[in-house]
Amino acid sequence: MAKIYRDADADLKYLDGKTVCIIGYGSQGHAHALNLKDSGVNVVVGLPEWDKATWERAEKDGMVVKKLSEAADGADVIAMLIPDMVQPAVYREHIQDKLKEGAMLMFAHGFNIHYNQIVPPEYVDVAMVAPKGPGPLVRRMYVEGKGVPSLVAVEQNYTGKALEVALAYAKGIGATRAGVIETTFKEETETDLFGEQVDLCGGVAEMIKMSFETLVEAGYQPEIAYFEVLHELKLIVDLIYEGGIYNMWSAVSETAKYGGMTRGKRIFTEQTREEMRKILKEIQTGEFAREWILENMAGRPVYNKLLQMEREHPIEKIGKELRAMMPWLKKD
């Protein structure tokens, strides 16, 4: 079973007298910075000079804001809370020459360390604290005296105190109130990518589109198809999210139970499982990472084309029209 750390297992004293530099002030960055500051930690936010709007927002929130290299200079913990694909360049240009002996390089996702896009010097600690929820939720739960479950991992333990410092950071953002699960950079990275590709993003999106196309091709109205295969999905996902898969089965009709349990395996077959294994292998071997890195180096031609195709799918047009009928939703 996984090791889970709670409030009693973490001590903010490991951040006493230290400066935590938060690189970025987006979804996670602003939450980490504000929570740590409210926990009594000395925080500085590092931002590019050209990002005036974010700079002003951070200062309005009461943060000390500096240019990237200045913020990192002399910091004891440097948290890289910017998108994966820009991290390596920012690290090379603004961070690596500012790392002092015994400092900690902190991440919220393991991609760049696991796939060697960032290779820290041996004289620093490397750790990860990854909340399993978006930044606004991390902030809101902290303010309410609660927390969001998170992951913690140590990749490099130069000082011998990397886990203690990482847990102090986790406590500072409120994570230990809920529980912090110990993992590794390898496990977090590979399972995160697998979930995105096979289930959460790739698998669900393709299932919805194919279901919609099947109904429309058979002559059913696209409006009805949209409601049945996309709109109602939230109702089912909420039931699973709140109480697990069996909770969903307990809540739906007997007809839905029987039809789902007898037909679902005809959609997701052993061939599907084999493709899942292939995708996992591509992640484990680094094949996907190399593909994605090269795609970015080439200017993202495949990525941009695929995104355009998604945007132009018929389900998007009909969805926009139907959502206009739903006053409880934010307008597109």
UniProtKB/Swiss-Prot annotation:
GO terms for biological process: isoleucine biosynthetic process; L-valine biosynthetic process. The keyword Membrane does not apply. Its EC number is 1.1.1.383. Residues 2-183 form the KARI N-terminal Rossmann domain. GO terms for molecular function: ketol-acid reductoisomerase activity; magnesium ion binding; NADP binding. Its cofactor is Mg(2+). Belongs to the ketol-acid reductoisomerase family. PANTHER family: KETOL-ACID REDUCTOISOMERASE, MITOCHONDRIAL. This is Ketol-acid reductoisomerase (NAD(P)(+)).
